[in-house]
């Protein structure tokens, strides 16, 4: 039976993702229809509900449904995903989230280990490297070399006999630093007070108090007297305190493992990335431990055996240290006939070329060519992946770069690498502001990559503020009209042309262009930087103007952060406001972080004649059922734990008796839970006048509103804030400090086009108030508003690291001598 070609197949009718009645967070029964296999951009002011719709509803439900296809046992190892609050979700496909979360905090995690490149490179050296030293494990700094022997029972001629067997695993980890690349020296005076005994609290290590479990273990170990000052210990006793191997002991009738202070600290503290530590732990590590490059492996993390094997004169440590754009060229040349030594030597320099010439004889060259031809598919895969790094604007990185040191934007683009060459189609890719950290020159390349994913038959959902990316969308969903409780509605859905004519805030500001600043401030002094050479900086000498707004520009990887964070941030009077995670428990919120809760609690206590502690969910006022958490965490053994709203307090966190106390009179009176449910803008009005006026609280709320956080709720968990929101929260806190120089790292991150003007006004107020403001930024509106610009480049990595321009924005536009100058000129129409 034949079917007419004009008749569409039933399967072709499922070309939409339908969302009906979405109510996550501030969404107000949102209903949208998103076309599949198209690029859809979600826009709107900060806090309008974009992430709630895209991440908390569409992507979350897709991932939850996929997780449910696995067995209960496997689900126990997966994150718990709650049902989104929505009436209907239809037409979902597999969602892959490419977010800005930083990659791995482990000290051994690098760009190479976080992608497939490191593994492919290890296989290449295990197959082609000379001399041959072992399998791919022999080149991994995460695998230690171990050997052993023992007796095994085997059956021979009908009898069981014991035979001695040996085994050996050849790993690539440097035995001295255990693959960390650095060794540590301990300042013992920071570990303990030698004039005190253990029971008197001699140990000054975090969490080692005499009342704590660790303190009890050391006091009752029996390896040294716990009641005598440490400076009276004998040498064996001191060795036991500091270096004792793990030993089972009994303390207070409980079997525990005792281990010396230094190995225990190395395992519990030094195995973590420094930036992932809690502030008090980080302060202790900085105080007690001095890190230096491992003298055995010279920071490469690899054993001498792993470093002895070479391909064309290059060992794996040298390959990983190359800039990725150079490594891609070196891999490409391996496929070429040997004899191109002159060309090949240009990759790493003349000295390396000479080394290769001496390493490879005529016979060795033929042998290498034969070996390389046997791994051609591997080389092709390596080339493709490394070329993707270059295409995505990350060619300036190296594979040995710690992954924890990548910015949120760099981490997001690194995660994109694995998807660019994927053979999957009909997948939904979800991106959270992919242009973060990108120079205008690099945004075009990012747009091309998004379009490539779409053209392979995938659905691409992008949350974005940059007009350069909004305009490439096939479909636009604009949320608003405001933020928080004033948002959560779809104010426009359709094409980019329709958005321009829609009259929404996004539509009105889509084609905004800032003009060059006319009234420039005169610097009052200069901050001298001499011989800056960290990372890719080339002995940079620069005078950073004081008393003005200085914007530091340049393509990604040009050396901006290295210059400012490496040479300015550590000086006296400098306040650095970055986008790093804010450490705290899941109970932490803007009210606790900013100190706002303290004057609020005192105001409640004074108005009701009770103690302030009653108005803390972490203290006397906590709900007795959930202990002030607002939710009950249930451990389901092999299945994932479940968090359910507390039935007693209904998520309000406080005891019912506390909620009877109110602040204010009449209809305006509020209890403490209602205050914490307010947005910053609502609380600013509440505490700004009348019976509820609290000046100390109002000052903090004014600063929060000034930095564009008026939509954030006072009791909102800090873990729900984006990188840009975290930075603005830190800025609000630091605005109350006495520092004279403020350093801001891309403060426009997460800001809507309409909010950038508010940020510029805030920066002006800081400078007019006597502060010096240094901003690392890519946004052309901020560049145009600067008093002075310092542009680094001309390229990224070893192609950058130089100051290519110093002067006013008008001078930069007039010269157009740099990439930044060209794009700023195009932006202002110069």
Model feature map: region roles:
Residues 1-830:
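Conserved phosphate-binding elements of NTP-dependent enzyme cores
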């Amino acid at each position: 039976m034949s079917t007419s070609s004009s008749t569409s197949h039933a399967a072709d009718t499922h070309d939409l993702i339908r969302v009906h009645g979405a109510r996550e967070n501030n969404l107000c029964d949102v209903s949208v229809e998103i076309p599949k296999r198209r690029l859809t951009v979600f826009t709107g002011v900060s806090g309008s509900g974009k992430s709630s719709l895209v991440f908390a509803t569409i992507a979350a439900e897709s991932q939850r449904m996929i997780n449910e296809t696995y067995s209960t046992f496997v689900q126990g190892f997966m994150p718990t995903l709650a049902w989104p609050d929505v009436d209907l979700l239809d037409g979902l496909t597999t969602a892959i989230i490419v977010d800005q979360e930083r990659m791995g905090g482990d000290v051994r995690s690098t760009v190479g280990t976080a992608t497939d490149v490191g593994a492919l490179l290890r296989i290449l050296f295990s197959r082609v490297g000379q001399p041959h030293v072992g399998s791919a494990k022999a080149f991994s700094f995460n695998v230690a070399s171990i050997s052993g022997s023992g007796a095994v029972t085997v059956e021979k001629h009908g009898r069981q006999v014991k035979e001695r067997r040996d085994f050996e695993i050849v790993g690539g980890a440097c035995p001295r630093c255990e693959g960390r690349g650095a060794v540590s020296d301990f300042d013992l005076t920071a570990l303990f007070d030698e004039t005190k005994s253990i029971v008197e609290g001699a140990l000054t290590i975090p969490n080692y108090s005499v009342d704590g479990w660790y303190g009890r273990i050391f006091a009752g170990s029996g390896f040294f007297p716990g009641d005598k000052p440490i400076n009276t210990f004998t040498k064996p006793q001191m060795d036991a305190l500091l270096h004792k191997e793990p030993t089972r002991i009994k303390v207070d009738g409980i079997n525990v493992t005792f281990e010396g202070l230094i190995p225990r600290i190395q395992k519990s503290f030094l195995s973590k990335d420094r930036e992932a530590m809690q502030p008090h732990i980080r302060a202790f590590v900085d105080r007690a431990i001095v890190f230096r490059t491992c003298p055995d492996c010279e920071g490469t993390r690899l054993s001498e055996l792993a470093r002895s094997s070479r391909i064309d004169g290059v060992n794996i440590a040298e390959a990983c240290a190359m800039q990725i754009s150079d490594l891609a060229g070196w891999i490409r040349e391996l496929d070429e006939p040997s004899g191109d030594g002159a060309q090949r030597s240009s990759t790493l320099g003349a000295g390396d070329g000479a080394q290769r010439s001496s390493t490879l004889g005529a016979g060795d060259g033929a042998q290498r060519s034969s070996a390389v031809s046997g791994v051609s598919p591997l080389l092709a895969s390596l080339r493709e992946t490394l070329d993707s790094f270059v295409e995505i604007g990350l060619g300036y990185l190296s594979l040995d770069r710690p992954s924890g040191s990548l910015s949120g934007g760099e981490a997001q683009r690194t995660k994109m690498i694995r998807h660019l060459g994927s053979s999957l189609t009909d997948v939904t890719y979800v991106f959270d502001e992919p242009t973060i950290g990108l120079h205008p020159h690099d945004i075009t390349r990012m747009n091309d990559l998004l379009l490539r994913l779409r053209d392979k038959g995938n659905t691409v959902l992008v949350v974005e503020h940059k007009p350069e990316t909004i305009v490439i969308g096939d479909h636009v969903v604009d949320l608003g009209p405001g933020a928080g409780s004033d948002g959560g509605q779809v104010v426009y859905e359709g094409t980019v042309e329709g958005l321009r004519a829609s009259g929404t805030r996004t539509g009105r500001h889509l084609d905004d262009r800032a003009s060059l600043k006319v009234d420039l401030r005169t610097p009052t002094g200069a901050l001298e930087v001499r011989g800056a050479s960290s990372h890719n900086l080339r002995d940079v000498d620069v005078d950073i103007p004081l008393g003005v707004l200085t914007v530091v520009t340049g393509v990604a990887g040009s050396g901006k952060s290295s210059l400012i964070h490496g040479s300015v941030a550590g000086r006296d009077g400098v306040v650095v406001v970055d986008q790093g995670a804010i450490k705290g428990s899941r109970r932490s919120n803007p009210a606790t972080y900013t100190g706002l809760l303290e004057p609020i609690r005192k105001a409640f206590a004074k108005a009701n004649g009770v103690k302030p502690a009653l108005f803390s969910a972490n203290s006397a006022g906590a709900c007795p059922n959930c202990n002030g958490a607002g939710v009950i965490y249930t451990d389901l053994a092999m299945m994932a734990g479940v968090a359910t709203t507390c039935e007693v307090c209904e998520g309000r966190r406080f005891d019912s008796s506390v909620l009877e106390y109110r602040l204010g009179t009449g209809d305006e009176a509020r209890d403490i839970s209602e205050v914490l449910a307010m947005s910053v803008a609502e609380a600013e009005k509440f505490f700004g006048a009348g019976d509820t006026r609290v000046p100390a609280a109002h000052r903090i709320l004014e600063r929060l509103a000034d930095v564009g956080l008026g939509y954030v709720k006072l009791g909102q968990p800090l873990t729900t804030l984006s990188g840009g929101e975290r930075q603005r929260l830190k800025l609000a806190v630091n605005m109350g400090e006495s520092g004279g120089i403020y350093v801001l790292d891309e403060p426009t991150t997460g800001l809507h086009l309409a909010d950038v003007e508010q940020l510029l006004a805030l920066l002006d107020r800081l400078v007019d108030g006597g502060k010096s403001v240094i901003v690392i930024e890519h946004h052309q509106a901020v560049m145009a508003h600067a008093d002075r610009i310092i542009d680094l480049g001309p390229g990224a990595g070893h192609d950058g690291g130089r100051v290519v321009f110093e002067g006013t924005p008008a001078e930069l536009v007039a010269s157009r001598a740099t990439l930044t100058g060209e794009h700023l000129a195009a932006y202002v129409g110069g």
